[in-house]
């Protein structure tokens, strides 16, 4: 029995590697969820989805805070182009940030 317990015990380095791996994965997935929300907002807007629809308003309400200062970075007269450019840049920003943070976490760990 004692041999079995010592064989399944993890070293501190193994435990740290597991925690770092999970944390890096969480950061990466969170970034991808944010990007997905922003991209869906762009697709719904470009596609001319009904703004009063529940799905459209859900993604609008979630994407506005995630776009930060990007939502009015460029102000073309066409509303669809404005959403495409500004929310597209915000999606790229979050994709890059989550990727960089994931690499930093893995490198530190």
Question: Over which residues does each language-model region extend?
Answer:
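Membrane-interface elements of multi-pass transporters and channels
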Residues: 46-51, 77, 104-108
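Alpha-helical membrane-inserting segments
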Residues: 39-43, 70-71, 97, 101, ...
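N-terminal signal-anchor transmembrane alpha helix
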Residues: 27-48
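Hydrophobic alpha-helical segments of integral membrane proteins
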Residues: 26, 55-73, 77
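Individual transmembrane alpha-helix segments
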Residues: 76-91
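N-terminal intrinsically disordered, cationic/polar leader segments
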Residues: 2, 6-18, 24
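Membrane-helix exit/juxtamembrane interface segments
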Residues: 41-62
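Helix-rich interaction surfaces within compact, conserved domain-sized segments
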Residues: 84, 92, 97, 101-109
């Amino acid at each position: 029995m004692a041999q079995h317990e010592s064989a399944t015990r993890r070293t501190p380095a193994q435990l740290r590697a597991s925690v770092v791996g999970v944390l890096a994965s969480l950061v990466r997935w969170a970034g991808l969820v944010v990007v997905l929300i922003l991209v869906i907002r762009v697709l719904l807007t470009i596609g001319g989805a009904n703004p009063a629809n529940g799905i459209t308003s859900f993604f609008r309400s979630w994407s506005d805070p995630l776009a930060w200062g990007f939502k009015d970075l460029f102000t073309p007269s066409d509303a669809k182009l404005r959403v495409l450019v500004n929310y597209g840049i915000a999606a790229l920003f979050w994709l890059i940030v989550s990727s960089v943070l994931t690499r930093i976490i893995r490198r530190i760990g």
